[in-house]
């Protein structure tokens, strides 16, 4: 059947970036770890981005995932906040890419559909289903729970023929 694939899901945020790691073997999923990388609210933007970078790099070095998945950001009315979130997302994509991992991206509604079966649902439903799908899962913040949902989404999507074709070519 092959070896288990270790997947890190990343929920980017400037204050808190959640991460969650699962192992996928066939149709089964196993919880590995989760957590949250925090940046100092009062620090300069560049310093905060460095804190996110260093924290995620430490997680990747320790956990040795094979693939990564990052949630796409939404655009809101506050352009400055959206730009800062985009910069944090850039760090969330850069760190695994620099480690040589393929980085997949998923829209929030795709994550919800993969985890709860519909593209629109609230955080409570998502977190409940994460616990159903990964009974041993623990998470310190909602960001870590969201990151586990992103990893679950990637585990489901990587089984598709279209995903395998994209990797091959």
UniProtKB/Swiss-Prot annotation:
Its cofactor is Mg(2+). Keywords: Cytoplasm, DNA damage, DNA recombination, DNA repair, DNA-binding, Endonuclease, Hydrolase, Magnesium, Metal-binding, Nuclease. Mg(2+) 2 binds at residue 71. InterPro entries: RNaseH-like_sf (IPR012337), RNaseH_sf (IPR036397), X-over_junc_endoDNase_RuvC (IPR002176). One of its GO terms (cellular component) is Holliday junction resolvase complex. GO terms for molecular function: crossover junction DNA endonuclease activity; DNA binding; magnesium ion binding. Its EC number is 3.1.21.10. Gene3D superfamilies: Ribonuclease H-like superfamily/Ribonuclease H. One of its GO terms (biological process) is DNA repair. It is found in: Cytoplasm. The keyword Ribosomal protein does not apply. It catalyses: Endonucleolytic cleavage at a junction such as a reciprocal single-stranded crossover between two homologous DNA duplexes (Holliday junction). It comes from the Bacteria. Mg(2+) 1 binds at residues 11, 143. The active site is at residues 11, 71, 143. Binds 2 Mg(2+) ion per subunit. It is an enzyme of class 3 (hydrolase). Belongs to the RuvC family. NCBIfam families: ruvC. Homodimer which binds Holliday junction (HJ) DNA. The HJ becomes 2-fold symmetrical on binding to RuvC with unstacked arms; it has a different conformation from HJ DNA in complex with RuvA. In the full resolvosome a probable DNA-RuvA(4)-RuvB(12)-RuvC(2) complex forms which resolves the HJ. The RuvA-RuvB-RuvC complex processes Holliday junction (HJ) DNA during genetic recombination and DNA repair. Endonuclease that resolves HJ intermediates. Cleaves cruciform DNA by making single-stranded nicks across the HJ at symmetrical positions within the homologous arms, yielding a 5'-phosphate and a 3'-hydroxyl group; requires a central core of homology in the junction. The consensus cleavage sequence is 5'-(A/T)TT(C/G)-3'. Cleavage occurs on the 3'-side of the TT dinucleotide at the point of strand exchange. This is Crossover junction endodeoxyribonuclease RuvC. The gene is ruvC.
């Amino acid at each position: 059947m092959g070896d288990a694939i270790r997947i890190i899901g990343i929920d980017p945020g400037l204050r808190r970036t959640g991460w969650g790691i699962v192992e996928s073997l066939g149709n089964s999923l196993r919880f590995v770890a989760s957590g949250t990388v925090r940046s100092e609210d009062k620090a300069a933007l560049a310093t905060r981005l460095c804190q996110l970078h260093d924290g995620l790099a430490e997680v990747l070095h320790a956990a040795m995932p094979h693939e990564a998945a990052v949630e796409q950001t939404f655009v809101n009315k506050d352009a400055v906040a959206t730009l800062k979130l985009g910069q944090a997302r850039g760090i969330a994509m850069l760190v695994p890419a620099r480690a040589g991992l393929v980085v997949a991206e998923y829209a929030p509604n795709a994550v919800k559909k993969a985890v709860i079966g519909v593209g629109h649902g609230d955080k409570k439903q998502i977190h409940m289903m994460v616990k159903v799908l990964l009974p041993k899962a623990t998470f310190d913040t909602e960001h870590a729970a969201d990151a586990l949902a992103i990893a679950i989404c990637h585990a489901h999507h990587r089984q598709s023929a279209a995903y395998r074709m994209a990797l091959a070519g």
